[in-house]
């Protein structure tokens, strides 16, 4: 049997507020989108006695043997949802790690979706929710890779056919540790996204919002602050925001030409930064 090929799209937080904390995790609300930057996953059943997981590509270095994919498969086996099947999985990594683009979580989400679609597993709604939480807090967002509002009570509302825009995604040579950034959160916001609507995805509305983790990451890493400032100066027709806990900074544009022009200027000034033009999907 040949491999099935899956595109695992990068997640972007168009806006994010930290609204509180329970015993283990911070509570957040977020307006989430996905962009045309993706990892490629090849998956097939194997006669091997163990799952075989491998990573290749530019961002495959330093991925631990215990990763989101191995975690997912272990959870499915512990819950006895997947029995008598082993898989060979190859992931070609195009999404940088420690960037706030959710690469690992989206890999797990897309494999989970594939296993359900191909009827290898048939979890109940409750089981699916539990699996996602056990693998990682972003995993549930990746099950449908569409514009989504995550409410502060962890409920998800998805929206179709929102207006698309262009994103210049920029990442310096360093990453941000999610744990370190969240551990520095001192203030919480009042929930603002508990009545989700499609209007929230309008360019003008998104411009007014922010990512409450950004100030922490920018104060820890002055280079990030400089990058954001440079992108903001480059065009008054965009808005610029960190995604997740960083270190990727995203400039959003309505026009591809403007996005491409800013990329050219940025690449000349910041030669050691990775940057990519993408479109929301």
Regions of interest found by a model, annotated:
Residues 1-99, 116-127, 171:
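ATP-binding N-lobe of GHMP and related small-molecule kinases
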Residues 16, 39-43, 140-142, 148, ...:
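Short beta-strand scaffold segments in enzyme catalytic cores
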Residues 30-32, 129, 139, 155-160:
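A generic local secondary-structure boundary/capping motif
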Residues 32-35, 132, 231, 266:
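Hydrophobic C-terminal alpha-helix "anchor/cap" residues
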Residues 51-53, 144, 148-239, 252-272, ...:
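Conserved, helical-rich catalytic subdomain that frames metal- and/or nucleotide-binding sites
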Residues 90-117, 137, 239-253:
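Glycine/serine-rich anion-binding loops at beta->alpha junctions
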Residues 112-152:
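Contiguous, small/hydrophobic- and glycine-enriched helical/loop subdomains that border
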